Swiss-Prot record:
Probably binds directly to helix 1 of the histone fold of histone H4, a region that is not accessible when H4 is in chromatin. Self associates. Associates with chromatin. Component of the CAF-1 complex, composed of Caf1-55, Caf1-105 and Caf1-180; within the CAF-1 complex, Caf1-180 interacts directly with both Caf1-55 and Caf1-105. Component of the NuRD complex, composed of at least Caf1-55, Mi-2, MTA1-like and HDAC1/Rpd3. Within the NuRD complex, Caf1-55 may interact directly with Mi-2, MTA1-like and HDAC1/Rpd3. This is Chromatin assembly factor 1 p55 subunit. GO terms for biological process: chromatin organization; chromatin remodeling; DNA replication-dependent chromatin assembly; eggshell chorion gene amplification; facultative heterochromatin formation; heterochromatin formation; negative regulation of DNA-templated transcription; negative regulation of transcription by RNA polymerase II. Keywords: Chromatin regulator, Nucleus, Phosphoprotein, Repeat, Repressor, Transcription, Transcription regulation, WD repeat. The keyword Transcription regulation applies. GO terms for molecular function: histone binding; histone deacetylase binding; protein homodimerization activity; transcription cis-regulatory region binding. One of its GO terms (cellular component) is transcription regulator complex. Its main location: nucleus. The modification Phosphoserine is found at residues 11, 100. WD repeats lie at residues 126-159, 179-210, 229-260, 275-306, 319-350, 376-407. Belongs to the WD repeat RBAP46/RBAP48/MSI1 family. Pfam families: CAF1C_H4-bd, WD40. It comes from Drosophila melanogaster (Fruit fly). Core histone-binding subunit that may target chromatin assembly factors, chromatin remodeling factors and histone deacetylases to their histone substrates in a manner that is regulated by nucleosomal DNA. Component of several complexes which regulate chromatin metabolism. The gene is Caf1-55.
Length: 430
């Protein structure tokens, strides 16, 4: 028998939480002109679990914007799923976000973010089930690998598919990669070895494929190696950015493992670290400093590591209120890192500020290394991506279909005082 009082209490809690989330969002929206140089919000037809900027950018003469592209996916309710390529028009320096266009009726600001900012889905490719994650191959950005709800990893060359999907819904990947027994999320292309792809799975393993190998019938390629060191769900995997044979993996066994493909032992990593006090969901190698990496965990912290001494955690970033599912270093700044997750927030951190003195008032907002909190999402953030061409621009996607493309105000990262007096900034006193 169901206890009705429990159900009533639960729905009351949900209603209260929803009210708090909505209040926080209204306050965030009012403050956007002071906190951001750009905010574009786009409601997708279906939520995307994945987001990655493609490396190319098109600038057109006489236009005050450039066109960038994004890889997205769908997570539908029993309808046909698709791998998506979207185009995004980003304003040039001289097309400034104008905070003066406040629309009292709508309670929001006009300016670039809502007027000229165009986001369009350009290519739709039929996909088997939702797209858990999609990542392009660095050596040829037309080649995209995807994680499916089955054990297969699919590879698509989007130039070989029509931009409108076949109405039959048939999914025709250019390659089908076999080796896993279950689905997963982690996916990483080797930036130094063309066609080498790693995948992490709920089956506790990591598979490595060489997509240049000769496929069997039905375009199937079997895993070249299967790494079996973890004892629980492997959440994420990442190649080192400089050393072609090194990669890292993290799992629900709370461990970070560093592997070297030159070692023939696929069950024993080179290094194993008890990284967190709960599941480890994500990792990212620093693009500028070859020894530095970060991991994010269900213990609500991001940890900083040095490959030369993994026994010692360099730092723990603490400010998130729930599980962390994604962590990514900025492609433009060695000391800048972002993390996101279940608490609906994306935090941007600056390592160079660790240990700086703070006033008591500032300390209440978070540690000195917490540079910025993006509060524009009202549901769990599934994925985010730093734009490789425009510094400080991030695309983030959440479970409620919302995609945001945004850039924090320049005075935040340049350490200048904002032009607006603090008394005019609305704060959340709830």
């Amino acid at each position: 028998m169901v206890d009705r009082s429990d159900n009533a209490a639960e729905s009351f809690d949900d209603a209260v939480e929803e009210r708090v989330i909505n209040e926080e969002y209204k306050i965030w929206k009012k403050n956007t002109p002071f906190l951001y140089d750009l905010v574009m919000t786009h409601a997708l037809e279906w939520p995307s679990l994945t987001a990655q900027w493609l490396p190319d950018v098109t600038k057109q003469d006489g236009k005050d914007y450039s066109v960038h592209r994004l890889i997205l996916g769908t997570h539908t309710s029993d309808e046909q799923n698709h791998l998506l390529i979207a185009s995004v028009q980003l304003p040039s320096e001289d097309a400034q976000f104008d905070g003066s266009h406040y629309d009292n009726e709508k309670g929001e600001f006009g300016g670039f973010g809502s007027v000229c900012g165009k986001i369009e889905i350009e290519i739709k490719i039929n996909h088997e089930g939702e797209v858990n994650r999609a990542r392009y191959m660095p050596q040829n950005a037309c080649v995209i690998a995807t994680k499916t709800p089955s054990s297969d990893v699919l590879v698509f060359d989007y130039t070989k598919h029509p931009s409108k999907p076949e109405p039959s819904g048939e999914c025709q990947p250019d390659l089908r990669l076999r080796g896993h027994q279950k689905e997963g999320y982690g996916l990483s292309w080797n930036p130094n070895l063309n066609g080498y792809l790693l995948s992490a799975s709920d089956d506790h393993t990591i598979c490595l494929w060489d997509i240049n190998a000769t496929p069997k019938e039905h375009r199937v390629i079997d895993a070249k190696n299967i790494f079996t060191g973890h004892t629980a769900v492997v959440e994420d995997v990442a190649w080192h950015l400089l050393h072609e044979s090194l990669f890292g993996s993290v799992a629900d066994d709370q461990k970070l493992m560093i592997w070297d493909t030159r070692n023939n032992n696929t069950s024993k990593p080179s290094h194993t670290v008890d990284a967190h006090t709960a599941e480890v969901n994500c990792l990212s190698f620093n693009p500028y400093s070859e020894f530095i990496l970060a991991t994010g965990s269900a213990d609500k912290t991001v940890a900083l590591w040095d490959l030369r001494n993994l026994k010692l955690k360099l730092h723990s970033f603490e400010s998130h209120k729930d599980e962390i599912f994604q962590v990514q270093w900025s492609p433009h700044n060695e000391t800048i890192l972002a993390s996101s997750g279940t608490d609906r927030r994306l935090h941007v951190w600056d390592l160079s500020k660790i240990g700086e003195e703070q006033s008591t008032e500032d300390a209440e907002d978070g540690p000195p290394e917490l540079l910025f909190i993006h509060g524009g999402h009202t549901a769990k953030i599934s994925d985010f991506s730093w734009n490789p061409n425009e510094p400080w621009i991030i695309c983030s996607v959440s479970e409620d279909n919302i995609m945001q493309v945004w850039q924090m105000a320049e005075n935040v990262y340049n350490d200048e005082e904002p032009e607006i007096p603090a008394s005019e900034l609305e704060t959340n006193t709830a």
